[in-house]
Amino acid sequence: MKKLICLFAVFLMLCGRAFALDANDLLPPEKAFVPELAVADDGVNVRFRIADGYYMYQAKIVGKTDPADLLGQPSFSKGEEKEDEFFGRQTVYHHEAQVAFPYAKAVGEPYKLVLTYQGCAEAGVCYPPVDTEFDISGNGTYHPQTDEPASAKDRFLQPSSQNGSGALPPPKGDEGGDSRFKLSWDTLNANLLAFFLAGLGLSFTACMYPLLPIVSSIVVGDKKAGKARAFVLSVVYVQGLSLTYTLVGIVAGLTGALLTVWLQQAWVVLAASALMVVLALSMFGLFNIQLPNAVQSYFQNQSSRLSGGKIVSVFIMGILSALIVGPCVAPPLAFALGYIGQTGDAVLGGLALYTLALGTGVPLIAIGTFGGHILPRAGDWMNAVKYAFGFILLAVAVYLATPHLPYYLVVALYTLLMLVPACMLLVNGRRQKRRPKAVAFALGGILLIGGAWFGWQGANGKTTALHHFLTLNPPAEAGKSSEHGKMFADTAALKAAMDTALKEHPDKPVVLDFYADWCISCKEMAAYTLNQPEVHQAVDMERFFQIDVTANTPEHQALLKEYGLFGPPGVFVVRSDGSRSEPLLGFVKADKFIEWYEQNR
């Protein structure tokens, strides 16, 4: 019994020290993540050896060359899905990751390859982006700078040099793609379901009106058709419709690498955002996007000449029908194609658009099989569906342009995109019957409250989970006070402010917190610890200083090295005599944070 009590006491002591993670226990990034390279005639293969207790982000693995644009779209080994409330679903790797970079064009001269990658320790500390350089000869072999043997071709090689220069800081939308909006084989089922539901939503817009008489003629063409035969004919018609969309999806997938390169340029991104706005306005009925009447009439005449009731004829009708309604559904289709283009995968692109077309075809199959009486009656709700797509397109436009717009303008735009539809629902809902009125009031109320809260928090420099999801973070203004203390991005300004505070009150220490946008534990600390009332009661937030090292500049790296950190988060108590506490690493709850502060103040 005494032994059991002793063991339990030791366990409690260990738990009490859990928040005091020792920085010496962490590996430097060059040991936590070791890239190894193999060069072939058709590209470069990279293998990362990852230490136990660490993981890497797929989306942060980027390859660039000098001269530029030698590499095509990379392909990755299968990773693990990690759901994060701040960054969404992420693909991560433990133990090992493999990446293949194909050559985008013939390579005949030596070039430099720079790999940028990033990972975290399971203990809660994230490393800044690391750059590793390789000098590669143009004949498909690795050019050694050390004592590497000449027979380096077709085997994994150690890097020639590593540095943490931060020359390639993690952009908000880097080449790895935003994993919250990523179509991949790992998330295939969820993505296909989303495309199917989007197609189902499109089917309830006025775009589908021209197809209704065509579907009716399919069944009429076979006078002896029962419901089973009508069902088969309707399905064949939808397959023809789907074929056209599938081909478009394949093209989008094949041109994905080119699309990715273009979307790295600011003017292209802003032009795409403007196009989304124009397409959204068409969904609001300000103008119509459609084929010229003469072209529409030609296609309709061609389809009417085909005899209904025959499988081949019905299939061709479906193909022609896609050309009739294509311009009408162009706005949401443009967004879908941009989404698919990130994959560079023709099969995935074709599957996605095929599923979208199937969703669009469900009501058409129902009409062909059972007749139009089984579908809801046309009315204002169909316009509501179009308006919903319009607001979604406007939100996409803002999301694309976010890196190139001022923070407070983006907050204002997102707020309007919630408040305007809320007001429309509440005003128009008054004219509806009981059930539609209840739905309109419920949705309108949620959007109104959510939009007001989102705007208020954003205007005051505070963040919510939605701000994090949209990658919206208040700009770090030197010395600006917030619920997280005084924020700095410039290290010189930070040191000057800390020195002033310590000279004014030498008997009171200050707290220094290292933060970065790409650090999950930093987000958790901001959302669940540093904003708690009990923390503000225990800690003078006027003496709480936060340095934002998101940009990972040489000055940021020097400060991290000065404090013995590989990356954020890390919190220190700094005293006027120059001494400082051991760092608080990783995420801890408010009570543990206060306990640590009281022990080190």
From Swiss-Prot:
Its main location: membrane. The chain crosses the membrane at residues 192-212, 243-263, 267-287, 311-331, 347-367, 381-401, 407-427, 439-459. Residues 21-191, 264-266, 332-346, 402-406, 460-601 are periplasmic. InterPro entries: Cyt_c_assmbl_TM_dom (IPR003834), DsbD_gamma (IPR035671), DsbDN (IPR028250), DsbDN_sf (IPR036929), Thiol_diS_interchange_DbsD (IPR022910), Thioredoxin-like_fold (IPR012336), Thioredoxin-like_sf (IPR036249), Thioredoxin_domain (IPR013766). Residues 467-601 form the Thioredoxin domain. The keyword Cell division does not apply. It is a multi-pass membrane protein. It catalyses: [protein]-dithiol + NAD(+) = [protein]-disulfide + NADH + H(+); [protein]-dithiol + NADP(+) = [protein]-disulfide + NADPH + H(+). Required to facilitate the formation of correct disulfide bonds in some periplasmic proteins and for the assembly of the periplasmic c-type cytochromes. Acts by transferring electrons from cytoplasmic thioredoxin to the periplasm. This transfer involves a cascade of disulfide bond formation and reduction steps. This is Thiol:disulfide interchange protein DsbD. It comes from Neisseria meningitidis serogroup A / serotype 4A (strain DSM 15465 / Z2491). The gene is dsbD.
